[in-house]
Every structure is written in structure tokens, then in C-alpha cells.
Design a protein with these regions (language model features):
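Transmembrane beta-barrel domains of Gram-negative outer membranes and organellar outer membranes
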Residues: 1-209
Length: 209
């Protein structure tokens, strides 16, 4: 999901989030590892390799830190803050790198029986464009079985349109190995902007010193 939750990876543990996103004209391959070394902080560094029919290959690199202020509980709303940066390296060497800085505040509201609503409010600074824009997201999780979860979200950035995703998550190994698949599009746009994703998430037990 693009809409983040307020949780972080377990203390002294790590995770790897990876996925492939396919559209009619592009293919993205993402991998973002993250670890919690303590202090209720999750550090992540990763990126993608993207191929587009019209511009060739583009790379994205990101680094971020997520601070959890209030853990999500059975009757407790969780709150976190994320600060990060993303660097875009265009396929055409004549174009300069683009760098964005972003802030996001994820809030997770528990509804009981492992049902959750996630609310995001944020801001992004596009260095090359010289603009600042608000960002937002609303997402939800609904368990269908002990291992299968339905997910849905809508999110956007000011002046960039509203997008949505629908999909499923499945635990292959509870709390350790999860796969997911989604379908998404931009609201009011033709089919050529739609996308499909397939993802894999790996979570480790605590092992860091």
C-alpha cells in the first residue's frame, strides 16, 4: 500500500519489502530493506529499477526514518512520523537528477478483530520543480481468513490527481513471510494508466545487538 500504517518493524529486527509494478508501458522492480536498531525508529534505504517504453531506464533511490510515537493497540490509535528523501536518476544522461524531500504522518485506527483504517497527511518538496505540495492517503485492512487480508486505499498529491488500489495480502508464514497483489489506477483516467503489482515481504526475528 502507498498509504502507510503507524507501526514499525519489531525492536532489533529487520524487514525486506519488495514488489514488481507493471503498466502497459513500464515495469518497476522495487526493494526496500528496513531495520529497527532501537529507540522506536525504523531506518530504510532502497530503490528501484524502472523501464519505460518511451524513456528507457530510470532509477529511484530513497532513504527514510520513521519514528513511532504511539504504538497501535487494541483500543489505541497509533501515530508515527516519517522523514525521507528520494533521488531520481533519469535514463537520459543530459537530464539532471531530481531530488524530493518528504514528510508523512501515518495514523492507524484499530476497529477490532484485526481491522484497521490508516490515515496519512504529509508534504513533499520537489527540488527541481521548486514546488511544495500536500499529500494524503486513506487505506483499510479487512481480514477474510486467518491468513488472507483484503486491502483498499485512495491517495494523492495536490495537482497530481487521485489514485486508488485494491488487493489481497496473504501470510505464507505468519508474521514472517507475506505476499500481496494489487490493482490500481488514477481516478478518471483511461485503462492505459492502470497497474498491477505483486509483492513479497520478509520479516526477521530480533537479532540485532
Amino acid at each position: 500500500m502507498n498509504t502507510d500504517d503507524a507501526n514499525i518493524v519489531d525492536d532489533k529486527a529487520c524487514q525486506l519489502e519488495s514488489w514488481v509494478k507493471s503498466t502497459r508501458t513500464s515495469l518497476e522492480r522495487w526493494a526496500i530493506p528496513g531495520c529497527n536498531f532501537g529507540g522506536e525508529l525504523e531506518w530504510s534505504v532502497g530503490g528501484n529499477n524502472q523501464t519505460e517504453d518511451t524513456v528507457g531506464k530510470t532509477q529511484f533511490w530513497l532513504g527514510q526514518v520513521k519514528k513511532r510515537w504511539v504504538p497501535v493497540g487494541e483500543n489505541t490509535v497509533g501515530i508515527s512520523t516519517t522523514l525521507g528523501t528520494m533521488v531520481t536518476r533519469p535514463a537520459m544522461g543530459s537530464q539532471p537528477e531530481d531530488k524530493d524531500y518528504y514528510l508523512n504522518v501515518p495514523v492507524t485506527v484499530p476497529l477490532g478483530q484485526d481491522r484497521f483504517v490508516h490515515l496519512n497527511a504529509g508534504w513533499v518538496n520537489h527540488q527541481t520543480l521548486g514546488t511544495n505540495r500536500p499529500t494524503w492517503g486513506v487505506g483499510g485492512e479487512l481480514p477474510l481468513t486467518a491468513r488472507v487480508i483484503a486491502i483498499a486505499e485512495t491517495y494523492g498529491e495536490a495537482a497530481m490527481g487521485t489514485r486508488y488500489q485494491l488487493g489481497l495480502r496473504m501470510w505464507l508464514v505468519p508474521q514472517r513471510v507475506q505476499i500481496d497483489t494489487t490493482y490500481g489506477n488514477r481516478i478518471g483516467q483511461p485503462e492505459h494508466e492502470r497497474w498491477f503489482t505483486v509483492g513479497l515481504r520478509l520479516l526477521s526475528p530480533a537479532f540485532l545487538p
